[in-house]
């Protein structure tokens, strides 16, 4: 980060931090914006060292401007950041990003006017851009595209497979190229022949449209003048390299290389949409996926969507939050609908990582512990149990702490010779006589039982006199052995 942060120093850094991001806003540019711009340039295969000079910033803006109409918010933000940095290098006093863009636009218009005036003043001079250069004899010659450039282009196509970042890479590698150079780059692509056929169809359509808008003038061509290029000439199929150089260096020039490049970029946009079959609705953040990686996948897919910029803005505002995981979604909704992408990424930084998991786990454990403590406290609020001394019979202390003289014998029955644990008072069997009298009958027996009675004898004997049982019979009944539980429960009807 140190090397990236050393782009601005001293007064330039102070001027940079005074510029606001938006007109009337509160946020200003900071050092982290330079670090972010450097990383984005590396993603687009551009040298971050270009940010250190105003000329380098101008070259970066020139490379990014063709893709601004179809680019994502990140690409537009990168262009605006570089434009503001250019004003700082040139010591142009600006207050916000919009004012910086207006200043650069004015400067470009003035530069274009100066170029036109210079061309009108000196028609003998011709422009020279690599790969078309002027040799020692003053002739315009062409230097073929280098093998290193071709290798970089092939590597990008093989690795990225026509992902959205292929277009800025093609624009950077084909700077100043002739139609022949562009065809060489396209011919080096070995695979993806279906995509190449789609690209050829797009080029043929644009060439036919060029021929329709630029009809051939009637009559022969005047001596010393070049014929007007047709669509096939711009595509490099019916024109020679010398004719292409002449058109590009003539006054006024016909930039056949730039025209052909625009056609190729238009075809590449169609291929990118075809090679991105995933819908933006299917881009959802995984439960453990960092928010930054999710945003990268989201905007990469959004870049290939066939929609207007307004629709893409709506998708960004709605789907980016809706398809986030529950942890990030809670944070994003708390920020509100007007939060910027920078605020979202800052708020969700670290969500899903080890630190975040440990923090969430600690909070959950803290809640569980607090719940257990509250339950324990609530359980202790019941009525207090009174203790009673077995020695003196008083409440409030135990027998081992009793100050009264030691009671001899059993504390239950009062007899000597045994202890409470060996006392038989509480071990009386069902039919024994040791049952404690003060407790009454067992709970499974009726306390007051009404003895069943039989109707009087006279009701069956139709008025005959009934005789009372003799005393002799009562004596016999008393002497009979107990053949039932009559002795315990009273008269048993079944025993008679």
From Swiss-Prot:
Q: What is this protein's record name? A: Gag polyprotein
* One biological process term in Gene Ontology: viral budding via host ESCRT complex
- Among the Pfam families in the record, one is Gag_p6
Q: Where is this region: Interaction with host CALM1?
A: 8-43
Gene it is expressed from: gag
Query: Which GO molecular function entries does the Swiss-Prot or TrEMBL record give?
Result: RNA binding; structural molecule activity; zinc ion binding
Q: Where is this motif: PTAP/PSAP motif?
A: 452-455
- The segments labelled Dimerization/Multimerization of capsid protein p24 in the record are 275-361
Gene3D superfamilies linked: 1.10.1200.30, 6.10.250.390, Human Immunodeficiency Virus Type 1 Capsid Protein, Immunodeficiency lentiviruses, gag gene matrix protein p17, Single helix bin, Zinc finger, CCHC-type
Q: Does the keyword RNA-binding apply?
A: yes
Lineage start: Viruses, Riboviria, Pararnavirae, Artverviricota, Revtraviricetes
Miscellaneous notes for this chain?
HIV-1 lineages are divided in three main groups, M (for Major), O (for Outlier), and N (for New, or Non-M, Non-O). The vast majority of strains found worldwide belong to the group M. Group O seems to be endemic to and largely confined to Cameroon and neighboring countries in West Central Africa, where these viruses represent a small minority of HIV-1 strains. The group N is represented by a limited number of isolates from Cameroonian persons. The group M is further subdivided in 9 clades or subtypes (A to D, F to H, J and K).
